[in-house]
């Protein structure tokens, strides 16, 4: 599952890390996150907030291309769930340009968005996570628990603090067993 999260900048953040996301009306950075079915991170990528979700996903995959190259062709395809902010055809075309065999190893699937009638029937309003996508939304919520990641304090778009947050989370989960 893949998702992005726009995060506001503080006054300490540099101009190089700033961007404005019109969709979420946020001046800052965007964290792109790919998680497994348990919500643990596979890949992370930070960009300016004005970078589209598609471009962020493509860059995240480019940085982790060895993961896909090492995957055997006789293994089942990995299904990547996307929300409606992504355009699978555009992503597929761009990924095939720099690694043509990648579509033999992965497939994209758009998560169906619940209609207003479905929300009303369930008695819910506002943001309702789509079935199976709540896992990546929960992972974004876990990131919000790390105080240094609530806002962007950094001068660069580095992933280090995001990865440290997930390492801490994984250690806590393993220690509880």
Language-model region placement:
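Tryptophan-centered motif/residue detector
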Residues: 5, 41-42, 134, 142, ...
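Aromatic-acidic/polar surface patches that form glycan- and anion
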Residues: 50, 157-160
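Helix-centered, glycine/charged polyanion-binding patches within enzymatic domains
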Residues: 69-158
């Amino acid at each position: 599952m893949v998702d992005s999260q726009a995060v506001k900048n503080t006054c300490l953040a540099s101009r190089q890390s700033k961007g404005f996301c019109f969709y979420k009306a946020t001046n800052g950075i965007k964290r792109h996150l790919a998680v497994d079915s348990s919500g643990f991170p596979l890949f992370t990528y930070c960009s300016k907030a004005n970078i589209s979700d598609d471009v962020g996903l493509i860059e995240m995959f480019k940085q982790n291309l060895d993961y896909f190259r090492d995957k055997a062709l006789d293994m089942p395809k990995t299904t990547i769930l996307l929300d409606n902010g992504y355009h699978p055809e555009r992503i597929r075309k761009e990924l095939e340009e720099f690694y043509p065999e990648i579509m033999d190893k992965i497939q994209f699937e758009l998560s169906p968005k619940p209609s207003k009638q479905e929300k009303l029937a369930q008695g819910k309003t506002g943001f309702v996570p789509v079935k199976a996508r709540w896992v990546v939304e929960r992972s974004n919520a876990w990131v919000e628990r790390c105080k240094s990641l609530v806002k962007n304090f950094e001068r660069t778009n580095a992933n280090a603090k995001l990865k440290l947050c997930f390492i801490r989370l994984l250690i806590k989960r393993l220690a509880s067993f």
